[in-house]
Amino acid sequence: MTRISVPAGQERNDGGISVPAGQERSDRGISVVLAGGGTAGHIEPAMAVADALTALDPDVRITALGTERGLETRLVPQRGYHLELITLVPLPRKLSADLFRLPMRVLRAVRQTRRILDEVSADVVVGFGGYVAVPAYLAARSLRTHRRVPVVVHEANASAGWANKVGARSAQRVLSAVPDPGLPHVEVVGVPVREAITSLDRMALRAEARAHFGFADDARVLLVFGGSQGAQSLNRAVAGAAEKLAEQGISVLHAHGPKNTLDLPAPRPGDPPYVAVPYLERMDLAYAAADLAVCRSGAMTVAEVSAVGLPAVYVPLPIGNGEQRLNALPVVEAGGGILVEDRSLTPEFVAETVPGLLNNADTLAAMTAAAALAGHPDAARRVAEVALEVARRARDLRTRR
């Protein structure tokens, strides 16, 4: 079990909890443990809920669980929250020595998590899936009867992963992004998204955003991104259509991933800008600058893009059981985007489809309105409210005993 040090500008209080400078811990505050590490798709919803919890109850105590190999070792301390590390428990996908080591790894991680729950006097565990969620779910229900910690599960994907299927069996409440993710008794709340995105006014920020990236005020802007590492098929298709897009007067903002490069033709005199960057530090400005996006359809991507009312061409990652396609379906069926399979995303498709959307003001306006209506900008607050309700009820029951 490892504690993560606090970054510069923050300080630890006597209880070992990292908090923003000047904010003190109250031992009387509700103690919430957030279990959602590994990838940004698990961490970002947890951090959005952490922010919402703090806004609803300034005395709340928040502890995030993670592993040393997850992105949480960087993202959680950056957001000013305390992180505890436990043993990584990946599920082997084929018969190997790791499969035989799995029971001992699970047991070790559960013991570590149980100790953390005791140390922080946890009132509720909120799990978001991923490798750290299963030990958290098992530890919460394996504590002594009078100290068992209630569990709230949040499933961001349209098809639940195995971790949340385990957690849902004993959870007090099961929250989800869609009505039927394969879990029982779900309450649809959407995917928690950080407040900086849900409060974004694209039109109010548009002039600043376009100036930031070097686009004209009246430009028609296509945003292309494939997650933090980019997406090769998106890169090839859009870069391959660069000349045709330029002929139609379309500007492009393309985040291609830090490990990737783009094969772009030399710009001709008078061509609109094709801005290629490895990574977008300011997604708020990128969303505000854009009229249309071409992107993957991970749960967080769909949640953010729809929350800001940005129409999109969703290209599901062609792996797994089709979860990304299911993630995009509600927005697409509402009219806020279109869906194209990865193998069908070609330069020819981009050159024909994107100008057809960006050059039709009525279609684009209708898609923008539909995308905004399909989003759930209050999801983080709703998850936080449920967590506090469950925690307070559990604390009251313990007090009466």
UniProtKB/Swiss-Prot annotation:
GO BP terms in the entry: carbohydrate metabolic process; cell division; cell wall organization; lipid glycosylation; peptidoglycan biosynthetic process; regulation of cell shape
GO molecular-function term, one example from the UniProt record: undecaprenyldiphospho-muramoylpentapeptide beta-N-acetylglucosaminyltransferase activity
Sequence segments annotated as region (Disordered): 1-24
Residue numbers binding UDP-N-acetyl-alpha-D-glucosamine: T39, A40, G41, N157, R194, S228, Q324
SUPFAM superfamilies: UDP-Glycosyltransferase/glycogen phosphorylase (SSF53756)
Domain of life: Bacteria
Catalytic reaction annotation: di-trans,octa-cis-undecaprenyl diphospho-N-acetyl-alpha-D-muramoyl-L-alanyl-D-glutamyl-meso-2,6-diaminopimeloyl-D-alanyl-D-alanine + UDP-N-acetyl-alpha-D-glucosamine = di-trans,octa-cis-undecaprenyl diphospho-[N-acetyl-alpha-D-glucosaminyl-(1->4)]-N-acetyl-alpha-D-muramoyl-L-alanyl-D-glutamyl-meso-2,6-diaminopimeloyl-D-alanyl-D-alanine + UDP + H(+)
Keywords linked to the UniProt accession: Cell cycle, Cell division, Cell membrane, Cell shape, Cell wall biogenesis/degradation, Glycosyltransferase, Membrane, Peptidoglycan synthesis, Transferase
CDD domains membership: GT28_MurG
Coiled-coil intervals, chain numbering: none
Places the protein is found: Cell membrane
EC number annotated for this UniProt entry: 2.4.1.227
Pathway: Cell wall biogenesis; peptidoglycan biosynthesis
Keyword Metal-binding assigned: no
Gene Ontology CC: one annotated term: plasma membrane
Membrane topology value: Peripheral membrane protein
Purpose: Cell wall formation. Catalyzes the transfer of a GlcNAc subunit on undecaprenyl-pyrophosphoryl-MurNAc-pentapeptide (lipid intermediate I) to form undecaprenyl-pyrophosphoryl-MurNAc-(pentapeptide)GlcNAc (lipid intermediate II).
Family, per entry: Belongs to the glycosyltransferase 28 family. MurG subfamily.
Protein's UniProt name: UDP-N-acetylglucosamine--N-acetylmuramyl-(pentapeptide) pyrophosphoryl-undecaprenol N-acetylglucosamine transferase
Organism of this sequence: Mycolicibacterium vanbaalenii (strain DSM 7251 / JCM 13017 / BCRC 16820 / KCTC 9966 / NRRL B-24157 / PYR-1) (Mycobacterium vanbaalenii)
Gene, per the UniProt record: murG
